[in-house]
Amino acid sequence: GLYIFANRKTYAWRYVYPGMAGMGLFVLFPLICTIAIAFTNYSSTNQLTFERAQQVLMDRSYQAGKSYNFSLFPAGDEWQLALTDGETGKNYLSDNFKIGGEQKLQLKETEALPSGEHAQLRVITQNRQALNQLTAVLPDESKVTMSSLRQFSGTQPLYTLADDGLLTNNQSGVKYRPNNDVGFYQTVNADGSWGDEKLSPGYTVSIGWDNFPRVFTDEGIQKPFFAIFVWTVVFSVLTVILTVAVGMVLACLVQWESLKGKAIYRVLLILPYAVPSFISILIFKGLFNQSFGEINMMLSALFGIKPAWFSDPTTARSMIVIVNTWLGYPYMMILCMGLLKAIPDDLYEASAMDGAGPFQNFFKITFPLLIKPLTPLMIASFAFNFNNFVLIQLLTNGGPDRLGTTTPAGYTDLLVSYTYRIAFEGGGGQDFGLAAAIATLIFLLVGALAIVNLKATRMKFD
């Protein structure tokens, strides 16, 4: 960037560079990261590197030996640690020390503990992290550390790491090896095959294309994926058709010369576009409330029905389309209002002389002349609604949920919200690798559909 703005030879690139840099930073970089994650097992159980996961396992310990009740006694600005053997009743006391950092305290047997009040549980809780770093050495040279808010116990490392990478459980004797195919330390059977037990946390490894076949072979993922894909396409197509139809008709009405108060109507019809969409969506969520919403109250009073907008798949999808049409028609109306100005009045005068009516004018003159320049914008609208995450997340959160799936999926989920739920709301853990694979497929699908639409449009109008 500095070279482009400092060198005269690259003067022309100064106007292109900000856009290219923004595209690289906000489009290409996230896309590359998403595709890279799709080829790994990155998930809530496999987030760490191999070295970090190994260190977490090596830091684990188990209780071995006696447990002692402990107390802290204030000694001016310092403290004394007292341990009591619950079996023999013997007391052990340390010298004065200050809390903070790793310390070894030599304890001596004593007949009586210091007089005065010992530290309350609140003080111990506040200093728990520092107390965990204390090692108390008893007269027999045995060492104990804090095991709970009331006790010090003898502890030993739970695992021992051999030079060949073999991990041994010191408590049970079970041996584990790193399985780089799944990203876990896993038990090894006598015949050298992998056992069933895995140690958590796991670590991130590359698994190649494994996430992509899961979308098509796992029954619990395959069924909702294809159903959600079909619904996503239907939703996007319906949204484009309805917003264009409503926007075009309203644009023709407010451009009607005989209509009085056209300016007021235009302002009122454009208002939904002026209100932030997330506010409108939340307002509609309240209006469609099944028990107290104004829409159901009105339908009940007029027709005696109360549709289950959020629990029935069909009515929930209808609600989604209705709300999205409300949010999208002002944009199409504004576009059509501008395009109508470009249609010569001579065409309508000539059709009037031939005896054509309003409907003939609309379908024979207005619609053909508007639809061609609108086509690229309709394709853009289709692509936008294909990934309309905000609408689904705020209005239905994907519900009502589908039953019998291994991933969280709902009847109103679009592919993008389905991907989000897999990544962040999975009941069996967050599966970022699978979500990234689905996101990659969505990218390819949207790109392919856009190319097909553009080619079909070009063939139609050439």
Language-model-detected regions and their locations in the chain:
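A structural signal for multi-pass alpha-helical bundles of membrane permease subunits
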Residues: 15-16, 22-45, 167-168, 173-206, ...
